[in-house]
Amino acid sequence: MYAGGDMHRGSQMPQPPMMRQSSASSTNINPDYHHPSGPFDPNVDSFGAKRMRKHTQRRAVDYTSTVVRYIQARTWQRDSRDRTTLQPTPAAAVDMLPTVAYSDNPSTSFAAKFVHASLNKNRCSINRVLWTPSGRRLITGSQSGEFTLWNGQSFNFEMILQAHDQPIRSMVWSHNENYMVSGDDGGTLKYWQNNMNNVKANKTAHKESIRDLSFCKTDLKFCSCSDDTTVKVWDFTKCVDESSLTGHGWDVKSVDWHPTKSLLVSGGKDQLVKLWDTRSGRELCSLHGHKNIVLSVKWNQNGNWLLTASKDQIIKLYDIRTMKELQSFRGHTKDVTSLAWHPCHEEYFVSGSSDGSICHWIVGHENPQIEIPNAHDNSVWDLAWHPIGYLLCSGSNDHTTKFWCRNRPADNPRDVLMQNQGYNEQGFGRQPDNFQPSEASPIPGAFVPGLTRNEGTIPGIGIAMPFDASSQGDHKQPLPGSMALGAPPLPPGPHPSLLGSGQQQGYQQQQQHQGHPQQMLPMPNMPHHQLPPSSHMPLHPHHLPRPMQMPPHGHMPPPSMPMSHQMPGSMGMQGGMNPQMSQSHFMGAPSGVFQGQPNSGGPQMYPQGRGGFNRPQMIPGYNNPFQQQQQPPLPPGPPPNNNQQHQ
C-alpha cells in the first residue's frame, strides 16, 4: 500500500468486514444495510451535523457583573453614605450592586420577579430545594427519590440521580461545604460529597420519615427529626446518634440548630415549639403560641430571633432573650408550609403556603410587603435563597421548581405581582385578564396627549389631536372608539371653518408660512406686509412640507389628494367655483370646512393650480426651477361638455 513513503494513489481499498466503521446508531441498523456508509472522515461529525435543535429563548441571571462593580466601587466608598443612588432608568442596571451592598435597604432584594420554571420529565412533587454552597447549581429532592441538578444561572437541566428508594424529605449542606446529608421517608440517612458521590448510608437512623436536618456550627454534629416523635443528635464522623430527645407527643415536623450555641429548636404536630440543650439532652422551654401543627421553625442569623410557622395561618417571631413573642404576621389564607430568612438582610424573610402563594415580609411591618397569590398551583413545600441573595427558589407540589429574582431599575411594577412575566412562547408578555401588552409604534411622531404610543396615531391617518392643547389643561377627555379619522394637529387658534372668508385667507396664509419655516427667502407673490417666520420657531412633523404624490398613469387622483396642475374637462373649469383653501394641510378634516356656501353654483372643487391666495403655488419636489415641468397625461373620460361648463 505504501511505496517510497507515499500512500497508494489508486482506488481506495475496501475495508474488511470486521474493520468496517460502525455508525452511532449501528445498534438499530443491520450491518448488511444496502446503503453502506462512505469513507470515514475524522474531521467531519456526520451524525452530529444532522441533529437539529429547536431554538428557544432562555433567560439567564448572572450576578458576576454586580460583584465586579462592587469590587470597583468599594475602593473609594468609606460606607453606605458614599454609595451612589440608582436612578429609575433601565440604563442604571449596569450600576447595580450585590444585595450585601444594600444592607440598610432590604426592599432592594425583594425577589418577586418570575424568571424560570423547571420541570422534570418524571412528574412528581418537589419536596426539598437546596443551593450548592457556591451557588452554581440547585439540587432538588423529589417524591420519586431523585436528585435533580439545575444550572444556577441559565436554569437548564444538568444531571439527575436516583439517590433514595423512597421520597426525599430533607437535605442540608455542612458549613465547610464538603458534605451533604439527606433523609427520606424510610428513615434512611445518606452522606454525599460535592460530586454527588454517596460515601455513607444509615438505613436505620429513624423508624419513620426524616422530616428535617440541621448542622451545628462546627460541623462535628448534626440533628434530625422524624415522625417517630424523636429528635436525634448525631456524630457526623461516626454516623451514630449520641442522644435522642423525646418530649414531643406526636410527629416532629421541623428542627433547626442555633447559629452559634448548643441550642436546638423543634416544632411538631402537638402544636408546641420546644428548645433543647444538646449537651445535657434536656428540654429548656416550650412555647404555646400556635393553635395547630407547627410546620417550620427557623433561627435568624443574629441568633436572637426565632421564626415559627403553623397550620393556623400565622407566623410568629420570638426573642429568646426574653422568651416572649415579638410579632405575629397574618397574611396567608391557608397553612404556612415553609420559611426562609434572607442571607444578607436579617429582617427580611419569605414564606410559602399550601395554596401556592408566596409572601415577602419585613420585621416590624404587620402586612406582607409583596404577596404573590398564584406563585404555584399547589403547596409550596420549600424555599431556598441563593448564597448571594439575589435569587429565590421554590419547590412545590405542582411538580415545578421556580426561580425568582429581584427587580432591576425601571422595571414594570406589574412584574412585582407576576402579572407580566414569562418569556416562552406561551407566556411571553402576558398580562392579567388577557390584556395584551402595548407595542411601541416604530414611526416617530406626535401622539394624542394622555395616550400611550400605540394608542396615538400617525399624523394624517389617525385620530386628530385637539386643536388647542392648552385648553384641556390637566383634565383630558377620553376619545371615543368610534371617532372617524381626522387631521393632524393645528396650531393654537380658532378653527378656519369658524372664520369669515377674509379671515380664512389670512389663516391659510399663516399656515403656508408655518409649512416652510426654514425658508428664509420670501415665497413668490407674498404680500409685502407679511414677514418670513423667525428661525427659532419649533418644527413639528405636521409642519414639514409633504412631497407631491402623483397618481399612476391612466387613473384619477383620489379626492383627498391635492392637485396643482391643470386638468381639462369639466373638473378643470372654474366657471362658477368659489375660491377654496388648500387641502394639503387639512387632510382628513370634515368636508364642510373646504366647501363654499350651499347656494353656490358649480362643482365644489379647488381652483386648479391656485392656492389659498388664488395665486400659483410652488410645490417642493415637483415644480421647482430645476425640474422640467411636464403636463401629466389626460385621464380617460368624455370630452368636456359645454352644458356643464355653463351650469
Curated annotation (Swiss-Prot):
Positions of short motif PPLPP motif 1: 488-492
Comp. bias regions, Low complexity: 478-487, 496-519, 526-538
Keywords: Developmental protein, Differentiation, Flowering, Nucleus, Repeat, WD repeat
Keyword Zinc: no
Reported phenotype of the disruption mutant: Embryo lethal.
WD repeats: 121-160, 163-202, 205-244, 247-286, 289-328, 331-371, 375-414
Record's subcellular location: Nucleus
Expression tissues: Expressed in embryos, in shoot and root meristems and in the vasculature.
Mutagenesis / variant outcome for changing residue 489 to S: Increased FLC levels and late flowering
Region described as Disordered: 1-58, 466-558, 593-647
Motif (PPLPP motif 2): 632-636
Protein function: Plays a role in the regulation of flowering time in the autonomous flowering pathway by decreasing FLOWERING LOCUS C mRNA levels. Required for the negative autoregulation of FCA expression. Acts probably as an RNA 3' end-processing factor. Required for growth and development in plants.
Subunit and interaction comment: Interacts transiently (via the PPLPP motifs) with FCA (via the WW domain). Interacts with CPSF73-I, CPSF73-II, CPSF100 and CPSF160 in the CPSF complex. The FCA/FY interaction leads to changes in FY/CPSF complex composition.
Protein name: Flowering time control protein FY
Organism, scientific name: Arabidopsis thaliana
